[in-house]
Each structure stands twice: as structure tokens, then as C-alpha cells.
Amino acid sequence: TMQRDLKQLDEQILELMKERVAKTNSEHVSEIEQLTKQLDLIASTVSYKTTFTPSPLVGYQGVSGAFSEQACQNFFSKDVKTIGYPEFEDVYIALKNGDIDYGVLPIENSSTGAINDNYDLIRKYGFYIVGETAVNVDQCLMGIKGLAQSSDFFFAHRFMNPMPYKDTAMAAQYVSEAKDPTKAAIASRLACELYGLEMLQEAIQNDKTNKTRFMVVSREFISPVDSDKVSVIFTLPHVVGSLSTMLEITALYGVNLEKIESRPIKEENWQYYFYIDFLGNMRDGSVSKAIEEMKAKASTFRLLGNYKKA
């Protein structure tokens, strides 16, 4: 297959590079050792791909018109084939079973912060982050679930009776099916179009710059050659300063740390794992060295992905 051929080609390139390094003068031994370590780090994930599956089937949480479906279209294309699932974990299960090629799931909102369930689920299922995209969360009047993000609007329109609904797109679907002129919903423009609703007012959310960042999840490690963001997950030994030591590694190698999250390990009381995002490409020497040193200092360590920043 093409994947097997690419894997064999990667292996051959790595071997040729090692042979060339081995012929270098002995005075450069330390440099050779460092380069070999970098090559070995990349070789350990030699089965990685640089391109995505053509014409993929992509899963997301929600129904048609959800912001998650919009994220699928943003990352892949307007014509991408998608399938919605009731819960976040249903997407992971579908990916595990091979029912879909990729999953697109929210990881962070600029107003409300991290979506912790998806940090926990990607760790639980052992998948990889292969890309990300950001969606402008413009809540438009036609229905409900943007209540927390649109409270200012309702304060100014107190004659309305806001009622929570499970999902913005589901709210739009409900209003469309109810055909009751006294009902409205708050949802995306996409939902408005899909369910044939009339746009009453656009962008009613409090924060006009509100965005949600979505991650693209895969069973396989895919790293485009122009990747510029790395995600890792790890646990640490119970030693004073162990976390600061990990963070010092990023400073030592000039790696720009973007995000750090700590999450409790559900199966182990008072134990935590850490999720870190930093900028870089694993093919670069300083980045591969930083990854290697982090791995050496951690109790457990996993490279979640190296992909293009949104």
C-alpha cells in the first residue's frame, strides 16, 4: 500500500542519513551522537503519515448545523462527509471501531475555557491530534443554548423567556419542527440555513470575538511537513520541582510554551496528568531534543501530535 511504501521510504532515508553521519571525521563524534538521537526519535514514529485520507468520513458531536460540523467544514472542505453523534465519547468509539476516519471535537473556548471531557477522552482512547481549527461562535437569534454567552442580550429583552436546550443546533431543529411563531432559538448561521429559519438578529453573544478551538483526532499519527505545533501528555514523579523541571526544558531549547492543563487521573486518587502545547516541528533539532529530554524526566510520556496551528 502507499502507506507501507512511505514507511519503507522513510526508513531508507533515515538509514542513509545515519550512514553519511557515520563517515564524518571522529572529531565530530558528539555532533554525530546528537544527530543520531534526533533521527532515532523520528524513527520511533516512522509509521507517521504526512497527508490525510482522501474523501474522509468525519465524526462530530451534535446534529447538522452544530458549530462542530462547521469546524469539520473549515478544516477539510465544505463538501466533507460528516456524521453527528449524541455525545463526545460516541465520536471516540466510532473512531476506535473504524466507522469514521477522523473526529473533530472542541478542546477550548475563548470565553469559558477548556473542554475537559475531551482532554480526558483523548488520553483514554490513545488517539492522536493531527490538526486544529478555530470557529467564530456567532450566536444568532432563532433559538437556545447560547444563554450563558448571550445574557446581556436577554437582560435588554426581558420580555423573552429563555429556556436551556441540549445543543444549539438541536434547538434550531426543534423550532423548525415545532412551527410555532412564539418559539425562537439561538444557534449558528449554518443551523439557520439548514433548518430554513428566518434570521432575526445576528451575533447576539456577549463576547463578539468568542471562538472555539477544535482538534482533529485520528487513529494514526499524521504530521504534515510544515507542522508548527506540538502536543504532549505526561505524568510526573512525586519529586519537588518536577513540573518546573519540565517547563525549564522548553526554555532551555527556546521552545515557546502555549498551554498547560492539569487533569486528575480518575482511576488514581490525587494523581494528575499534564497536557502541554508548544510551538515547533519535531523535525527541528531543538524541538526533538526538548521532546527527548521531557520523555526522560517524565514518569509516563506520550507525543499526542505535531500539526499545523489554527
For every predicted segment, state its role:
Residues T1-A310:
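Domain-level signature for soluble enzymes in the chorismate/prephenate branch of the shikimate pathway
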